[in-house]
Amino acid sequence: MSDLKEAIQLIDENKQFNPSTLNYFTKCLGDKNVGVKYHVISVFGSQSSGKSTLLNKLFDTKFDTMDAQVKRQQTTRGIWLSHSANIYSSGAANQSIPDFFVLDVEGSDGAERGEDQDFERKAALFALSVSEVLIVNMWENQVGLYQGNNMGLLKTVFEVNLSLFGKNENRHKVALLFVIRDFTGQTPLESLEASLVLELEKMWSQLSKPEGCEDTSFHDFFVPNFFGLGHKVFQPEQFDNDVKSLGDLFVDQDASFFKDEYHTHLPLDGWSLYAENCWEQIENNKDLDLPTQQILVARFKTDEIAAAAYNKFLNDYQSQVTDSLDGKELATVLKTLQSTCIDVDYDPFASRYAKKVYEERRDDLIKQLNTIIDETITNFVTRTTSSLIETFHKNARDRSLKGPFKLKIQSALEKASRTFKTNLAPFSELELLSSMDAYISKFEARVNTEVADLQERELNAIVARFNKGLTIKLKDTILHLLAKPTINVWDDVMKEFTSFLDGSLKKYTNEDGKIDFQTGATTDANDKTEHTLKRNAWSFLDHTVHGYLTEDNVVDIMRNVFNDKFRYDDDGMPKFWKNEAEVDASYRLAKSQALSVLDALAIVKNKDNVEILIPEALLESDGDGSDYEENGGQEEEEAGLYHQQRFSHVLSALQKDKIITKFKQFTDLVIIEAKRSIVNTTERIPLYMYALVVALGWGRIITILRNPATIILSIIVLAGAYFVHKLNLWGPLLQFANQATGQATAVLKQTVRSLVVDEEPKRKILVEPHESEGVDKEPSKNDQHL
């Protein structure tokens, strides 16, 4: 242990706390572990009343003191701290003395601060908060005075102290040691003591007490003690002996100065932090709580024990909790970890400390554990929910299961809910969950969402299959009826359309005649789907009819009808006209029937001449109807009528005129061709001309027939022509001939080009002799050209 006696300024005159206090303790004590075996003593009194001198004499400290022979002025500024292990007493030098930490507080009523008493009050309150013994240094002649013995300052300090600590059940008591300086003994110490106690009690009764502290007394917070010291200058020996006697009171372990209720019960490092916090709260006028040593130690130790237990819990948790555990296994592991942490690692060690603190920290630890447990259960529920949802989808779509989709969903839903509750039950049984209702409700909401999604998908699939059936089963039939129309073509079309629509909905019609698609969906969803099917069917019919019956297609249909009636009889045999009258009759009949087909196709109506309209309820709306309502509904009515008439009115009058014009052009050509064929037939070559040709050319015919080469060549040519015609090879043969002709032409051009190139050297040879004979001759025009 160091013999360091120099003091440090704990709080400077600018009210700043010294952050190196703990280092000072380390320098003073070295490696010594004092624990709570130390005492804090402070001194309070007027400026220049000899406080520092008394402390230096009594505790062997080195506080600065005033040189009265030079000037009386402020010496101690702020609050100073010094360590002492020596007490000036009459006892043996080697007796065991605890460690003392002495606070020298700046004197009150100094000229330097004047009327500024803020620091005086805060310093006095700080000394009361952190000290076991507060030495009140006063002169004997100040007893009975109010300002002279700092009673005004004490009243203010006591009042603030009461407002801060009065409601604390574990009140921190302080021993007030009134040291009466220059005590002459003329007035007995007991009389002075009685006067001071009376003043203190009277002052206490006049305090403004907070609610709940009305019945408190001065002695509930303070234990007054009194001691007289002789005059230091005029009674040096008496003063010395009195200081020794006072020191004996501090050394005597049985003295009343060091009762357990005075001590803060904090380790020394804890006292440093505690003192700093006290000063910060006093400086900032915050409520100050001075817990007892048991509370502080309990908090410190229970925090330490809880932290160790929690860390062990985390280590065990990371090694034992995995995603592969099922509900029962996971619940067992979590319950074991929780019980071990609380019952084994925390309770046996922490229960030895203050019950209230132990229970509070236990609750905090349980909350920490529950946070992890709840998070683990939530993750488990999330994984379980995802797995069950996936299984639910598989079961709902299992094609091996017979029955309506509604029964499949219901069965899959019951199975998923049952499995979920089974997996969650162990957590409730082991009290890891207070209630499963929240998780079950959340799971059911998730499953219901999936059910609604599957139902919607199934309804969409029904609509898709219906739309596909329209294309596969109905479209070709309608197009066939339109391609070969009759006068009652629309009755036939609507018969097929109604038959398909009713047949598609019949299997979904229940006994009450209402549509139920057996998906478990609501009535509104079924009605909406039924409406969609019917609307799609009519929309399909609309697009099919209007898409096929274009102007060109209608002209083709009329041509076919005209040709069938004009060129063929009722038995389907081709007609052979003998005269123009027959042609004209067939023409008029065929044209009339073709035009009647045009009239039938132009407007969708039944045999009773009533237009067939799309049901008004199935007409698609262009908006929410709000725009129509502003106009009294008139525009909406007109729009609906337009869509209905658009379906039934296939061809407009203008389109019919165009179609008739194109059709007339076709029929005019047909009748002209027919009449021309009659003329050609009646003006054929006479038969005697054929006989004359044979008679005159008989010799040539015999010559050809008698020539074997001609016969063989004719047979080969005729056979080749027959096979080419039979195999339909005239096209490839013609293409081959064209290619052969092209290649022959290319070869011929190449041959001519080669001949020209070969002729060129010969011409050069003929020219060179002439050039050698006359080099200076001008070249001829042919040479220049070459």
Swiss-Prot record:
Localization in the cell: Endoplasmic reticulum membrane
Segments crossing the lipid bilayer: 685-705, 709-729
Coiled coil stretches, renumbered: 355-375
Cytoplasmic topology ranges: 1-684, 730-786
GO CC terms in record: endoplasmic reticulum membrane
Membrane topology: Multi-pass membrane protein
Region (Disordered): 765-786
PROSITE patterns registered for this protein in UniProt: G_GB1_RHD3
List of residues binding GTP: 45-52
GO MF annotation: an example: GTP binding
Primary location class: endoplasmic reticulum
One protein family per Pfam: Sey1_3HB
EC code(s) of this entry: 3.6.5.-
All residue ranges annotated as the GB1/RHD3-type G domain in the record: 35-262
Listed GO biological process terms: endoplasmic reticulum membrane fusion
Stretches in topological domain Lumenal: 706-708
Function recorded in the entry: Cooperates with the reticulon proteins and tubule-shaping DP1 family proteins to generate and maintain the structure of the tubular endoplasmic reticulum network. Has GTPase activity, which is required for its function in ER organization.
Family: Belongs to the TRAFAC class dynamin-like GTPase superfamily. GB1/RHD3 GTPase family. RHD3 subfamily.
Name of the protein: Protein SEY1
Species this chain originates from: Kluyveromyces lactis (strain ATCC 8585 / CBS 2359 / DSM 70799 / NBRC 1267 / NRRL Y-1140 / WM37) (Yeast)
Encoding gene (name): SEY1
